Amino acid sequence: MLTLESVTKRFGGLTAVRAVRLEVRRGDLLGIIGPNGAGKTTLFNVIAGYYRPEEGRIVFEGRDVTGLAAHAISRLGLTRTFQIVKPFGNLSVADNVMIGALTRLPRVRDARVEAERVIALCGLGPHAAARARALPIGLRKRLEVARALATRPRLLLLDEVMAGLNPSELTGIIDLVRRVHAEGVTLIVIEHVMAAMMRLAQRIVVLHHGEKVAEGTPEFIAGDRRVVDAYLGEEFVLADA
């Protein structure tokens, strides 16, 4: 479904992503982990068309999308969320989601129906009329996912949707990610909440200093000495034992 061929992104003299190769199959739920500054969000921005790579190629569903603008890639069915959520604060939850739907469904009636479906899926029904700026962080995270889903992606990139959530909110967002995946959406998830990632992901990729240093099942990654030393730490291994 998605292939990255030696993708490299530089900012001046800094190489943020270095020769990353990746293969994502339809139906995958792939996790990406790594320390702060490892290049995870930059990689998302390159995949989704916000940054153009200096080297390498990105192929989505058989089409070379390297260098395409983000809006063009989104229309093809590849969309991302953002770690720092910025909804239209003065608009209602329903209107925020409708804006996403209108990018794929030009008729307002159709967009409204799609928005209602996505709002229900994301558990935002009781808050549909609320202004986005009034939502607590847990609901704003759900709204960010809903806005992306309204564009009808086949591949969705989720950037730290669990960050800053309390245990109850975390449980809810994990359930939401599972529901979205069950709807047939292929997912790539960046996350620092490792206990959740270990339960959710079918496969995990580890980035360190912009390079892919490991890839495998959660069990394999938890036992990889390079990953433990660079990121997870002995405390995680002992807690998971």
Model region roles, listed by residue range:
Residues M1-A241:
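Glycine-rich phosphate-binding loops of nucleotide-dependent enzymes
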